[in-house]
Amino acid sequence: MAKVAVLMADGFEEVEALGVVDILRRAEVDVDTVSIKEEQVVISSRNIPVRADKTLTDMDYYDMIVIPGGAGAWTLRDDDRIISLIKKYDHEERYIAAICAGPMALGKAGVITNKKVTS
């Protein structure tokens, strides 16, 4: 069964992160929300506290990562750990999805050069 990690930083857009989780879980895909902070509680763009399933340091193997938009996308883009993770997934030809502002991190990681990207 495929495993998907939805990365979340403070300011994440609720519908872009949790909508993905909802749809994939309904399809019986194994999905974890992952806080990039040391603590599991992440504050959404509308100030809703959401308890992530894991933190970045607790991440297991995933077939795919999802990078949601919202103000949290800038935090993801500026986090060297996330950039390294994106580069690793690209190098290993695993799936990477990014929504709305999320592709900024892909651009910074240099994984979308000469590729067709839709957001």
Placement of each model-derived feature along the sequence:
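Extended, subdomain-level signal for the structured scaffold at the beginning of enzyme domains
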Residues: M1-E92, I96, M104-N114
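Active-site oxyanion/phosphate-handling segment shared across diverse enzymes
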Residues: T118-S119
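Catalytic, metal-anchored helix/loop core of enzyme active sites in primary metabolism
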Residues: C100
